């Protein structure tokens, strides 16, 4: 039967906002999982105690921005429009129906001029600390990767610029080891002349709209100005750290500041899982020397097309020579400034070699083989990737760090940014990742009853008996709660 409802939009009603928000709403879960009054401790030094106009509650300002990032709203203007009309949003920030929400410019001004990078970092760490206290973090293995964020800059508005080449962070250590290696081989060490020569420059393309962004062009991606978010997460997809750089900075270059942050906050981690972009001599050396393991993937050798395969050249550690496919020795020649030992063949042997065309096209009939002084650490990573434990860890990358990037872009609006400048984009990314961690924390807090200790104690037991979990990965906790059993099974543990 057709029913035509009469519209009565002017009717007066008494409404209890508490009853209008469902008990299983996401914002209720987040509000129950964490105490937002902690934010007052982070911002109290930024306000005057006895002077000035009354401010908007800083907790309200942070809750508004968290709403924007949790629901992937594109701008603060749109966010405040939604907050004004959405009952759940009003309940979350504590504003009744008849109270006007803050103007979007007030929120924008505070996050641009009052709440600095330190404040945002405190909030990011506070959310992670809350998750750690509940036992949700599993930092035994850390997954590292980078993803690009399209900048608010037109590719056509660009200009060429000569910028000085930045020295590598490990340049001093490499220089010392190169000289030590040269002295061991009877060569004269290099002189330190970096202070005498002006720094080398390189030509690059800079956006006239956002000069701090960088050109990004990789694979099938369209060329654009972008930023790069170098990120680390744990086994439960909690984001542990992020370092934002221009889009033209390689992953291996940005690894050091991110790894410093991880070592400072999570020194207990044992394994770093990363793709081939991080499989460099310096990164391998740093991770293995710190007593940890780098779990990475196979790297296709960059050899000559239709030439000898890479494994046909064998390094003889005893004689410090390289044996070529025709069983001739390439003897040590020198160690260059980049840290590579050069092994060269004898020209008279190469002239009569039947496979010279597959080996070298040098006019001098001389084959040069390069081997880094830290190559042994790369070989350690290559050996470790064949172990079953680390092979399985690497297979989890697509479910961990790649899933974090997919959720951030598809559900939380991180595909492109409307902010300009490295500092603003960094704060924007950290707040977005804090919101994602908060969302996960809220879901876990509400889905697991306080009496169910399976999930919360899993990490504590794994930390104490980690060696047994490495040998028997099927060993887990006996928890009969339905939700907990599902979550523990998702994490890779058995409940029987």
PLM regions and their residue ranges:
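Anion-binding and metal-coordination hotspots
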Residues: 3, 72-85, 95-496
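Hydrophobic alpha-helical membrane-insertion signals
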Residues: 1-28
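Short secondary-structure boundary/capping segments within folded domains
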Residues: 18-21, 53, 221
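Short amphipathic alpha-helical interface patches used for protein-protein assembly/oligomerization
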Residues: 89-93
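Basic, short loop/linker segments at the boundary and entry of helix-turn-helix/winged-helix-like folds
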Residues: 23-66, 71-72
């Amino acid at each position: 039967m057709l029913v035509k409802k009469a519209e009565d939009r002017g009717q007066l009603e008494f409404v209890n906002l508490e009853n209008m928000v469902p008990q299983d709403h996401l914002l209720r879960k987040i509000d129950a999982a964490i105490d937002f009054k902690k934010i007052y401790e982070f911002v109290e030094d930024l306000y005057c105690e006895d002077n000035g106009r009354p401010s908007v509650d800083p907790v309200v300002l942070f809750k508004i921005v968290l709403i924007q990032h949790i629901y992937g709203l594109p701008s603060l203007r749109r966010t405040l429009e939604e907050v004004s009309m959405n009952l759940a949003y009003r309940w979350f920030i504590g504003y009744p129906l008849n109270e006007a929400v803050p103007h979007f410019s007030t929120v924008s001004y505070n996050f641009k001029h009052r709440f600095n990078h330190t404040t945002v970092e405190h909030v990011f760490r506070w959310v992670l600390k809350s998750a750690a206290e509940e036992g949700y973090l599993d930092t035994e293995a850390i997954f590292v990767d980078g993803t690009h964020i399209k900048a608010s800059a037109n590719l056509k508005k660009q200009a060429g610029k000569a910028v000085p080449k930045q020295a590598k962070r490990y340049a001093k250590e490499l220089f010392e080891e190169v000289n030590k290696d040269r002295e061991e081989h009877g060569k004269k060490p290099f002189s330190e002349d970096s202070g005498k020569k002006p720094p080398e420059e390189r030509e690059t393309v800079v956006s006239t709209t956002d000069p701090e962004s960088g050109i990004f062009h990789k694979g099938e991606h369209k060329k654009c100005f972008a930023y790069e978010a170098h990120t680390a997460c744990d086994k439960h997809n909690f984001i542990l750290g992020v370092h934002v750089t221009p889009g033209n900075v390689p992953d291996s270059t940005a690894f050091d500041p991110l790894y410093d942050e991880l070592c400072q906050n999570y020194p207990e981690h044992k394994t770093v899982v990363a793709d081939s972009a991080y499989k460099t001599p310096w990164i391998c050396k740093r991770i293995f020397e710190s007593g940890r393991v780098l779990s990475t993937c196979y790297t296709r050798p960059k050899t000559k097309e239709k030439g000898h395969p890479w494994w046909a050249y064998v390094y003889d550690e005893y004689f410090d020579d390289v044996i070529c496919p025709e069983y001739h020795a390439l003897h040590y020649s020198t160690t260059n400034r980049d840290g590579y030992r050069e092994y060269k063949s004898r020209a008279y042997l190469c002239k009569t070699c039947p496979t010279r065309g597959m080996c070298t096209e040098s006019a001098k009939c001389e084959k040069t083989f390069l081997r880094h002084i830290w190559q042994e650490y790369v070989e350690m990573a290559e050996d470790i990737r064949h172990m079953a434990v680390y092979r399985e860890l690497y297979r989890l990358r697509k479910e961990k760090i790649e899933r974090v990037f997919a959720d951030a872009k598809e559900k939380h609006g991180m595909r492109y940014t409307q902010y300009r400048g490295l500092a603003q984009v960094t704060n924007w990314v950290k707040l977005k990742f804090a919101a994602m961690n908060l969302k996960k924390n809220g879901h876990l807090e509400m889905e697991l009853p306080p009496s169910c200790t399976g999930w919360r104690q899993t990490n504590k037991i794994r930390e104490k008996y980690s060696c047994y979990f490495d040998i028997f990965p099927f060993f887990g906790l006996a928890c009969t709660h339905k939700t907990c059993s599902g979550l523990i099974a998702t994490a890779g543990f058995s409940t029987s």
